[in-house]
Curated annotation (Swiss-Prot):
The active site is at residues 205, 339. This is Enolase. It is found in: Cytoplasm; Secreted; Cell surface. (2R)-2-phosphoglycerate binds at residues 163, 339, 368-369, 390. InterPro entries: Enolase, Enolase-like_C_sf, Enolase-like_N, Enolase_C, Enolase_CS, Enolase_N. NCBIfam families: eno. The keyword Nucleus does not apply. Catalyzes the reversible conversion of 2-phosphoglycerate (2-PG) into phosphoenolpyruvate (PEP). It is essential for the degradation of carbohydrates via glycolysis. It comes from the Bacteria.
């Protein structure tokens, strides 16, 4: 394969109206790759650093000209002339140039933009779809979608503490059918909310953001919507939560302030709260049930629920192999959420997923609340045979872009395509 001859970064706009980095990579044999970098709202403190300008006169300080300049100057100088197929070498060279543990000098948004665009250019030069280039010939597993249909927490302006209430169409026979089932429940939920006089405006990730009386009320209306769409809750469709509990954790007291419900819970009480929800509703997965720093709380939760449901570490692990290794050794959680911009290169992303899978942890490939039309994560989910993807609701084109790419991939794979439904939770008893 040929070498990289041109790299160009630019500032574009994400789904929240904030700037982000987009990178184009060209090879000497005509390969081309373009990638846009996502951005999170609720972020883990140990995530790789997203470089913002801080100039209040542009985009309220959120401009990314510094990161774009890094792409077009110092990073380009290192990467130009390198073999486009040398993903590990390119990523390692950029990490070394940055020289920090969290990519804070040049910005994870700059480094990731190049990392993803390089992979796309290499795939283009090989005349292969990205999932096949990254995953090889055995790539065939389509993911079960986690579809965020009610938004709360940092993703919405309402009184619901839990950030995401999701559905997982586990009884579907294909990813395309799962997407259809999710769309039907989404439209059914809109009718249910309207019938109750509730708001049907959507949050950052396309889910509805109604003012509900409690977190449990959100689960009740979702179950009602599933039934109204003609499906059986718990049999056809499971529920999943992203609590994003760092957003309601009180570091001074060590307690969890569910302000929407007017309750303050200790670690033990929060575990009991989750156990009660799991007993009452067909919940198969809980993400970030405890704060990223509250490993004692995570241990309590894993001991109580780790054999029954998927316990996903997002802010807990931040797609970082070193932190994940510590979690595995301590028996914390049983799944990792994978966000490419938390770590900043494709190489490190793949390393984290491979480590998780070797340890019997599941991996959920995820979007961020600030997204673009870039659908790279759909290809990554298939390339890694991850079996699960979390990429928002059935509205907003930045979310739909990923679902449509999965539909195309499944069609392209034809009879080779696999969709495993409940089997993706291979570590539950």
């Amino acid at each position: 394969m040929s070498s990289i001859v041109e790299i160009h970064g630019r500032e574009v706009i994400d789904s929240r109206g904030n700037p982000t980095v987009e990178v184009d990579v060209y090879t000497e044999d005509g390969g081309f790759g373009r990638a846009a970098v996502p951005s999170g709202a609720s972020t883990g403190s140990r995530e790789a650093v997203e470089l913002r300008d801080g100039d209040k006169s542009r985009f309220l300080g959120k401009g990314v000209r510094k990161a774009v300049d890094a792409v077009n100057t110092v990073l380009a100088e290192v990467v130009l002339g390198m073999e486009v197929a040398d993903q590990k070498g390119i990523d390692a060279a950029m990490i070394a140039l940055d020289g920090t543990h969290n990519k804070s000098r040049l910005g994870a948004n700059a480094i990731l933009g190049i990392s993803m665009a390089v992979a796309k250019a290499a795939a283009d030069e090989c005349d292969l779809p990205l999932y096949r280039y990254l995953g090889g010939t055995n790539t065939s597993l389509l993911p079960v979608p986690m579809m965020n249909i009610i938004n709360g927490g940092a993703h919405a302006d309402n009184n619901v503490d839990i950030q995401e209430f999701m559905i997982m169409p586990v009884a579907a026979t294909s990813c395309t059918e799962a997407i259809r089932m999710g769309a039907e429940v989404f439209h059914s939920l809109k009718k249910v909310l309207k019938s109750k006089g509730l708001n049907t405006a959507v949050g950052d990730e396309g889910g509805f953001a109604p003012n509900l009386g409690s977190n449990e009320e959100a689960l009740k209306v979702i179950v009602e919507a599933i039934e109204a769409a003609g499906y059986k809750p718990g049999e056809d469709i499971k529920l999943a939560l992203d609590c994003a509990s760092s957003e309601f954790y009180n570091k001074e007291t060590g307690n969890y302030d569910l302000t929407g419900e007017g309750r303050v819970l200790t670690k033990q009480e929060l575990v009991a709260f989750y156990e009660d929800l799991v007993a009452k509703y067909p919940i198969i997965s809980i993400e970030d049930g405890f704060d990223e720093s509250d490993w004692d709380g995570w241990k309590l939760m894993t001991e109580a629920l780790g054999n029954k449901i998927q316990l996903v570490g997002d802010d807990l692990f931040v797609t970082n192999s070193k932190i994940l290794a510590e979690g595995i050794s301590k028996g914390i959680a049983n799944s990792i959420l994978v966000k490419v911009n938390q770590i900043g290169t494709l190489t490190e992303t793949f390393e984290a997923v491979e480590m998780a899978q070797r340890a019997g942890y599941t991996a959920v490939i995820s979007h961020r609340s600030g997204e673009t039309e870039d659908a790279t994560i759909a290809d990554i989910a298939v390339a890694l045979n991850a079996g699960q993807i979390k990429t928002g609701s059935m509205s907003r084109s930045d979310r739909i872009a990923k679902y449509n790419q999965l539909i195309r991939i499944e069609e392209e794979l034809g009879g080779m395509a696999r969709f495993e439904g409940m089997k993706v939770f291979y570590n539950l008893r």
